[in-house]
Structures are given as structure tokens and as C-alpha cells.
Regions:
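Non-catalytic cap/lid and distal C-terminal segments of serine-dependent acyl enzymes
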Residues: 2-299
């Protein structure tokens, strides 16, 4: 590695290592932490290159939640894949937070977009951070261990929104997409989250500003998608999800686009949390393997 990364912790897990790293982001103007799981084949005496998955977490999360709650390390080890998960927002004393309806607005709620409202525009650029800085940083720092052509993205809730919007805009980077209970149509007003977060970051949904909103609305992006044909695994919980009225999954899967195949799974009896994710995450790993090269490259 080049010295841009600082190791915060490292724990052996299923023969590999779950690391937490830190770096300074020039895009966000603050230090950022992320998790990275390296399976045993990447840390052996003769390491090999493997596929990579980028996970995006939901509202209120840090880089820690996914690491300690999802149980993903077992399956990253089984399927021989590196898993990387960034934080969900910029953080620090100099990072602006708060609006009239939420004094902590912004913390753990970056929505994977580039804010345009003056208060947030300098720091809240999670879209540019991920696409222009974080992914290239990971590819460079771990280049000897990664098969870049076998790269996927997945996420939950706000992170599912991020996985969809970023994945659909960048098929050249991400060859596979899967989501757990994503926010699907934030251009539509809902009671709790989505619309009002985009409004705080982007300004009113009117006039020429509509184009800014459309960049971060999965339903709009899916309807306009013209990239290579993509199958998306879409895991959605049923009536026990207290945020179903905010997620609007039916709005998204109603989009008919010949270049998108919705692999939609309705999981009744589960709620919106990590018990749901940990139950079905192995299926997501298995799904992504369909789109990867099968061989590992020896060093």
C-alpha cells in the first residue's frame, strides 16, 4: 500500500482478516473510515486476486454496523471475495449538520449524492467520493488482490438507494447489483425519509432542479437506463417493514425496461433490520458470482 491508509483495527475471521481503515478524503474534506474483509486466499503466503463487492449501509449507520451485524465474513470467505464498506456520511467537528426539522441532519445520512444547497455542498459529496475517490483508492491500494472486472455493489435501505443509483449510472464499474429493502423513489413525498432528505441536500423539486433530483431517483434512472442488460436482485420485506411507505418498492419494479431484469424476492415476516440481511446475505453473494470470472489469478 502507498501510505494513504491508516489501519485502525484488524481481526482474524474465518481465516481471513476484517480490517477497519482510515484515510483523508479530499472530496469530503475530512477523515473517513471503512471496513475491508480480505478472505484467507488474499492473506496467504501465495495470495491470489479475487472479485470485490462494495456494500453501502443505511441511515444511522457507520462503517461498523455491517461488519458486526451481517455475518458476511463467513460468505466472503466461502465465495472468496473482498468486501469493502465505506461510512455513510462525512464526519467531524467542521462538518455542518442540522436543519429545522432535525438538529442532527446529515450525520450518517449522506444519501450517496452530491449536495447542491450551500450549507452542505462543500462536504456532502458522497456520490463523487465513492465513484471518483473511494473506489479508485481501493483499486489502487489493493490492486494486487482485486479482479477489477469482477466488481459488484449492494446495499440496504439508503444504501440500497445508493447501490441502485450508482450501479445503474456506472455499469462500467459494477457488473452486478443487489439490494435489501432500498429507498426506490425519493422524488415522491413520503412520511419519514427520502424526499425531505433530497430536498434538504438539493433544494426544491421544481424547474431546472428537477434534473438534479432525477440523478438520485432509482425509478427515474431505471426507466431511462440504456446500458448493458443487467439483472438486479431485489430483496424486499413485507408488511412488517415499518418503513414500507417510504421505500415504495412497487414503484420501482413496475418500471419496464428491456435492459433490466428484476429478480424480486418478497420476504414476509421479516422487518427492516439486520436479522433480515443476515438471513439472506448468502443468497446475495451467490447471485453476484454469476457475473464474475471463475478463475483466480495467481500472483
Amino acid at each position: 500500500m502507498t501510505g494513504k491508509l491508516k489501519q485502525i483495527s484488524s481481526s482474524c475471521c474465518f481465516g481471513g482478516y476484517q480490517n477497519v481503515m482510515e484515510h483523508f478524503s479530499d472530496v469530503l474534506n475530512c477523515k473517513m473510515k471503512f471496513g475491508i474483509y480480505l478472505p484467507d486466499c488474499c492473506v496467504s503466503k501465495e495470495p491470489v486476486s479475487v472479485p470485490i463487492l462494495f456494500w453501502l449501509s443505511g441511515l444511522t449507520c457507520t462503517e461498523e454496523n455491517f461488519i458486526i451485524k451481517s455475518g458476511m465474513q463467513r460468505f466472503a470467505s466461502k465465495f472468496k471475495v473482498i468486501v469493502v464498506n465505506p461510512d455513510t456520511s462525512p464526519r467531524g467537528e467542521d462538518i455542518p449538520v442540522g436543519i429545522d426539522w432535525d438538529p442532527n441532519f446529515g450525520v450518517a445520512a449522506g444519501f450517496y449524492l452530491d449536495a447542491t444547497e450551500p450549507k452542505f455542498a462543500k462536504n456532502y459529496k458522497m456520490y463523487s467520493y465513492l465513484v471518483k475517490e473511494f473506489v479508485p483508492l481501493i483499486f489502487e491500494e489493493y490492486k494486487e488482490l482485486i479482479i477489477k472486472q469482477s466488481c459488484g455493489i449492494f446495499g440496504h435501505s439508503m444504501g440500497g438507494h445508493g447501490a441502485l443509483t450508482i450501479g445503474l449510472k456506472h455499469p462500467e464499474l459494477f457488473k452486478s447489483i443487489s439490494v435489501f429493502a432500498p429507498i426506490c423513489n425519493p422524488m415522491k413525498k413520503t412520511p419519514n425519509f427520502g424526499y425531505k432528505h433530497l430536498e434538504a441536500f438539493l433544494g426544491p423539486l421544481e424547474g431546472e432542479n428537477i434534473l438534479q433530483w432525477e440523478k438520485y431517483d432509482s425509478m427515474t434512472l431505471a426507466s431511462k437506463y440504456k446500458g448493458p442488460k443487467v439483472e438486479i436482485l431485489f430483496d424486499q420485506v413485507g408488511s412488517k417493514d415499518p418503513f414500507l411507505q417510504d421505500l415504495l418498492p412497487n414503484n420501482l419494479i413496475s418500471v419496464s425496461n428491456p435492459n433490466i431484469v428484476w429478480n424480486y424476492q418478497l420476504r414476509e415476516n421479516y422487518d427492516h433490520g439486520y436479522y433480515f440481511i443476515s438471513t439472506f446475505i448468502e443468497e446475495h453473494f451467490s447471485f453476484h458470482t454469476k457475473f464474475w470470472g471463475k478463475e483466480e489469478k495467481k500472483k
